[in-house]
Amino acid sequence: MSKLKNFTKLSAIFLAAVCLLSVNVSAKNPTDSAYKNYQYNAYGESLYAPATFLPSEKITGKKLGISEFNAPTDTVSANGKIYILDSNNGRIVAINSSDYSLFKVYDVFVDSEGSQIDFKGAQGIAVSKDGNFYIADTNNKRILVFDSECRLKLTILKPEEVLNDSKVPFDVKKIVVNSDNQIFALCSSINSGILAFSAEGKFLYFFGKNTVEVTSDIIKNSMLNKFLSKEQRALRAKATPVNYSNLSIDDDGFIYTVKAEAFQKTEKSVIQCLSYTGENILKEIEFGDYEVDYLTNYHERTETSFVDVGTDAYGNLYILDSGRGRIYQYDKNGLFTSAFGGIDGYDGTFTNPTSLIVNNEDVLISDERENCIQIFKPTVYGQKVLGAYSVNDSNELEKRYDAWSDVLELNSNNISAYYEIGTVYDEMGEYKQAMDAFKIAGAQNEYSKAFQSYRKNFMNRNMLVIIAGIVLLCAAIYFSASFVKKKTSVKTGTAFSVLENKWTFPLYTLKHPVDGFEQFKTRNCESYLLAIGIILLLFIGDIFSFFKTGFIFNINRAIDFNLPVTIMKSFGFIVLFAVANWSVCTLLNGKGTFKEIFTSVAYAMLPYVFSVYLRTIMSNFLTANESIFLTVINVIGILWSAMLVIAAIYSVHQYSFGQTVGAILLTLLAMAIIGFLIILFYTLLTQVYSFAYSVISELVLKSR
């Protein structure tokens, strides 16, 4: 495959583009559209991207040669037509999906007696394969079913047998119909799930009920209720699951839902794809605009209001955000592909978008306030992307590679392209190249699978060398252990040989913590230089871990490294513990000096230091399924060091075990207090500096 050699070049282009384009999303080509075009990289940062969709035309009543729309609240595509629910006009306008020309206006709906039926204010529409119309008549609290000639076939009212609470209205807002003509209705006042009806209008069951999300407020209220009387609990608001705000159905009969959480920060499971059993089978990702602050590990999410969701023939998701007037596109792997649209009323933007449908490769958005349907068509770049998706299921790997390479030539920031190219390499058995592509895409799970195959092939090719290396390593460990054991053993009639040299003393405490720290105090083995050396090893280990932990377990970048935080994790923590313990134990008649406390605690950190280096090295040879080994190494290092700290405090201060535990608990409390005081002092110092700076600046300005 000749073109496979281009991947290294494309990777270099991508890395260069990240350096040049990791800027505010306002850095766009102003000729592309009236809104910002961007996508997110593997680190959650917005980067410039060519426009995937641009506004093509607006469908209005005037353009179709009919009276103007009045609040088009919903649209649906069926049978080669697009049906627009013109809510306040009480009519349905059908246009041809091929050229968006007028097909027919349905404005006279009658019952069996010939009386006209009015459904003005309706919020939802569905059309079956046999041409029947299903109307969510919201104001009249009913579902109307008409045949293709607009004659009433069925009226569905509130199912009293399951909704026996007379206070709960049947305010049906959205509706979909599957291939068996089963009806799924959404009511904003009913949080038990989607109501499923048979083709004859009989209530069947609730479908896809949401659960109450466990939050700190839920836990707090639950604990508080235990102390309240029955009457008091009855007066308190009950936690109820969040309802849906919209739903749609794809060609395979899967129902997509949108949670009713207007203008709330995005979260996982806001968009769901419900299986036939009502379970969410969609990958849980965070939808919407976001920028990630890696230094504080806090995900800043812009406020948004999702109102509709649609899919195309390739499994891509299109999500409409009425709060920001944007459409977000995600591929079937959950990767953010593009965003387009906006709020301001210009071409390609909206004032009150209400519904979304995908017609072939076009995206149609109804704007209730502007009384129009805005059509977006893919650009040249967008056509390349959709064309690449169209061949994704092909067995022709060369064709798939070429398609996604063409996408990268137009946009080297497209992580979906790297993901798909990685998939091609993986299917070819080129696991090293697949790992490189998955790494750029930030696809850790796929990287792990490719690495597992690569590791297996490597071991098969180099088994003899690996076995020889393991034998040599075991021999080196054995002789090293024998040497250390000899140096740390007790010889008859002599002292501990290791204690004759304080530089090797910490090794003895690893195996003999109590005896070791007893000798530490009696023989004055403390050394500031050695203690600082161990802490320095911890500091270097943290840096080593940050940069060299395997990609499967770590996607840190060099620019995310925070030196002050790293210093606080190593030097700062141990110094703070030593100061707090010395302060507490001075009041509790402890025998240890500050030097003894500081050095003994530093010595006790040696197992954890070893675990940091071992964990980092091992992370480059393990897969995601083997992460338990890293957890075990980390836990052993922490517990071993914690045990040594207890032994150190026990021996240095000459405490009983109970006194030692109490002293450590008080030390932790003192650390919290000291930390609070440091933060308070820093805050006050900052405010004083700001005040002094403003005063001096004012004086300088007045003196001119």
Predicted regions, residues:
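Hydrophobic core
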Residues: 15-23
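Eukaryotic scaffold repeat domains enriched in small/polar residues
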Residues: 28-425, 559
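Juxtamembrane boundary at the C-terminal end of a transmembrane helix
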Residues: 677-704
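Hydrophobic alpha-helical transmembrane segments and adjacent short intramembrane/lumenal linkers
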Residues: 564-568, 577-679, 684
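Selected alpha-helical membrane-embedding segments in polytopic membrane proteins
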Residues: 495-595
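TPR/TPR-like (Sel1-like) alpha-helical repeat modules
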Residues: 426-448, 475-477
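Selective detector of the "anchor" transmembrane alpha-helix that sits immediately C-terminal
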Residues: 459-483
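Boundary/linker segments of alpha-helical solenoid repeat arrays
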Residues: 414-416, 442-457
